[in-house]
Design a protein with these regions (language model features):
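Terminal targeting signals and extreme-terminal segments of soluble enzymes
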Residues: 1-140
Length: 140
């Protein structure tokens, strides 16, 4: 699948993020309709019971929400997570997981987004909603 992004600099910045490279998250889409990430769960991503660690899932949910927001925000703005709620609905078994994010509200100072993670069979593994603070980055 080809990557689509409103601003290629957003994609480049996220692909260079140390955490995302470390865990192997790959951005496939970031545009006005939201974001799409993939990760292949390997033994290095699992907890004691052999399924994806909740921290990996939360990192994926957080990234999906933030990138969906960044794709709709001006290039000279960033966002930071203020709060996030996650629900885990099924185990994230080894294999490919897909995370998607969408903007619910883009306010002047705060923004709200949601995200979901699904397994290879389309089963919902985790869902979240988060509030993010918008700020000027000074990079523009």
């Amino acid at each position: 699948m080809a990557t689509e992004v409103l601003d290629p600099a957003i994609l480049e910045r996220w692909n260079e993020c140390g955490y995302y490279r470390l865990v192997g998250m790959r951005v496939e889409r970031a545009d006005g309709d939201g974001s799409l990430f993939r990760i292949t769960i390997t033994p290095g991503h699992t907890q004691l019971y052999g399924t994806a660690h909740g921290g990996i899932l939360c990192g994926m949910l957080d990234a999906a929400m933030a990138l969906a927001l960044l794709a709709k925000m001006p290039a000279d703005e960033g966002c930071a997570t203020v709060e996030m709620k996650a629900n885990f609905t099924a185990p994230g078994n080894p294999g490919e997981l897909t995370g998607s994010g969408a903007v619910l509200d883009l306010g002047r100072r705060l923004a709200v987004a949601r995200a979901e993670v699904h397994d290879e069979n389309g089963r919902l593994v985790a869902t979240s909603q988060g509030t993010f603070m918008r700020f000027k980055t000074g990079d523009a």
